[in-house]
């Protein structure tokens, strides 16, 4: 599949094993005859594995270089990556094919496309690659702590550890992008034109100096920068439930789309006259993501292939056909990108939760006769599978 010779493949396997050992990662690739086998430790996370494989990948290095240097000259970047300009050109052409799903491209050594999409792409990428150590290092920075405290003050609520991590990643990306001249804010400003007078947005805007590590926002960019930040908060489960209710209570495009989705679900008798607050919250996040962004980086090839694998163990009714009818009536949910698959998967998770919202407790027995190591492995596999659904809690 890779097109590598066995000698080249062996060289890469040795390189990856050496790098894993140097970084203290419990990971080994075994090459046995014609078979490759991956062994990982119980503490090894998926993002650690992805980081190991991506670190020396040319396309990934191009993306990282662009974030921290804003632009490049082809001959200089080729020298830095120790490749020819022709090879760099081939990688850029291939990378642009991937980026087209996000309405983005790299042209003449610069990003081309809406600014909120550039930051969203980096957020999707780094969220799957950043190590725990990287996240913790950024969490300890005074400017990040101040940003968390400021947002908690505005919301009147504490953020969870996961919300803090996502906020830290987004603000780090935004801080790097502040150095870029002539960012394209027109698309996000047009999408969110109904929210410039929103009371929560105005409150957030007044606190602008407390974000972006205290950097001064260039003249004429403050509205665009703050609207991109506001859009991220609206769409990535950062804001608490009561804050989202407050924002959506003033109307706007997102509230309209949410109302349409709820109406379509009522037609299918999935919702009654009263919708639980946390269900409305989850639906609002799905609406915000499809309205504001395009594209997604799937976690793995098979997770979202619903035609090959049903996402749940307990679901009595298959709602995929119902989902197709509902989303067909709402053009915003039909991007033709991998984001569609992610949104469908999360919507089905929510429907299963609603169908099983009695808080059903189950005891799962595991065979202990094979010893502790086998038991631990079985428990880890079971936990990974079930935790694909955020509405299942494992105690």
Regions found by a protein language model. Give the residues of each.
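A cross-family "folded-core" feature that marks the main globular domain of proteins
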Residues: 1-395
């Amino acid at each position: 599949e890779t097109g590598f010779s066995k000698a080249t493949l062996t060289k890469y396997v040795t390189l990856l094993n050496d790098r894993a050992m140097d970084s203290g990662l419990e990971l080994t690739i075994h090459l046995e005859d014609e078979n490759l086998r991956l062994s990982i430790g119980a503490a090894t996370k998926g993002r650690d594995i992805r980081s190991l494989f991506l670190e020396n990948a040319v396309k990934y290095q191009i993306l990282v270089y662009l974030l921290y240097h804003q632009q490049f000259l082809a001959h200089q970047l080729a020298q830095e990556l120790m490749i020819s300009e022709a090879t760099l050109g081939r990688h850029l052409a291939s990378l642009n094919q991937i980026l087209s799903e996000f309405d983005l491209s790299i042209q003449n050594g610069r990003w081309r496309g809406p600014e909120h999409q550039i930051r969203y792409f980096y957020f999707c990428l780094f969220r799957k690659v950043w190590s725990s150590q990287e996240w913790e290092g950024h969490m300890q920075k005074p400017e990040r702590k101040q940003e968390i405290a400021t947002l908690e003050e505005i919301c009147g609520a504490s953020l969870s550890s996961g919300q803090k991590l996502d906020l830290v990643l987004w603000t780090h990306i935004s801080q790097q992008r502040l150095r870029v001249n002539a960012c394209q804010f027109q698309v996000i400003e047009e999408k969110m034109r109904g929210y410039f007078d929103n009371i929560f947005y105005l409150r957030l805007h007044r606190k602008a100096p407390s974000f972006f590590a205290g950097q001064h926002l260039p003249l004429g960019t403050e509205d665009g920068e703050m609207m991109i930040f506001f859009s991220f908060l609206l769409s990535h489960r950062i804001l608490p439930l009561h804050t989202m209710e407050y924002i959506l209570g003033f109307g706007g495009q997102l509230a309209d789309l949410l109302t349409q989705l709820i109406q379509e679900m009522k037609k299918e008798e999935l919702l009654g006259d009263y919708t639980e607050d946390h269900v409305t919250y989850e639906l609002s996040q799905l609406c915000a993501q499809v309205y504001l962004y395009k594209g997604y980086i799937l976690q793995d090839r098979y997770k979202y292939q619903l035609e090959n694998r049903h996402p749940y163990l307990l679901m009595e009714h298959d709602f995929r056909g119902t989902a197709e009818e509902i989303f067909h009536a709402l053009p915003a949910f039909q991007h033709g990108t991998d984001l569609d698959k992610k949104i469908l998967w999360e919507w089905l998770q929510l429907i299963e939760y609603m169908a099983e919202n009695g808080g059903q407790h189950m005891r799962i027995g595991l065979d202990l006769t094979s010893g502790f190591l086998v038991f631990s492995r079985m428990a880890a596999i079971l936990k990974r599978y079930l935790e694909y659904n955020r509405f299942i809690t494992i105690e």
